[in-house]
Regions:
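Non-cytosolic coordination micro-motifs
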Residues: 1-15, 48, 53-160
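A glycine-rich, hydrophobic loop/mini-helix early in the fold
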Residues: 11-53
């Protein structure tokens, strides 16, 4: 990648948390990848790879892309899924793939997806907050949610 394209960074996480990542292609929004390691200083034992934003040159598991809508993700998963409501630090995350294709793409490997809603779309109170929602709920579909983050993570030995 070249030294100028692999930079340690600290990014904002949920609830005011600061997260150490290694950014690959940090200045190129279409190719940027954020990688975490068990030891960020030594960059050993890969724990996650994340793409986020509106567009990316990278494609996630099963053909998953940033910008995909709920219906597309259901098709890729092979079934509906459960996600959290919007408007809070953990809002829009898929919380249960319901045993679909994106549930576990390889032993010990998880796919995490976060949806967002466009700023110009008025979201109903029904899709806000911490409560779980089915991807099939009419209010979720009406919100025009799109994938804004895809993360692939690997469980560590102590998590098995």
């Amino acid at each position: 990648f070249g030294a100028q394209n692999v930079i340690p960074e600290t990014i904002d996480g949920p609830e005011g948390e600061q997260v150490n990542v290694t950014a690959i292609y940090p200045q190129d929004r279409s190719r940027r990848i954020e990688v975490t390691f068990a030891s960020e200083e030594e960059r050993t034992v890969l724990t996650s790879v994340t793409i986020r934003g509106e567009v990316s040159a990278w494609t996630g598991p099963g053909g998953l892309n940033l910008g995909d809508g709920i219906e597309t993700v259901e098709r890729l998963n092979g079934k509906p899924f459960t996600m959290s409501g919007f408007g809070w630090d953990y809002g829009g995350y898929v919380t249960d793939w319901q045993g679909g294709k994106l549930n576990q793409i390889a032993p010990g490997c998880r796919t995490t997806v976060r949806f967002n809603i466009p700023p110009d779309v008025h979201s109903e109170d029904a899709v806000l907050g911490e409560a779980p929602h089915s991807s099939t709920e009419p209010a979720m579909r009406k919100a025009s949610a799109y994938v804004e983050e895809i993360q692939i993570s690997w469980m560590q030995e102590h998590e098995y």
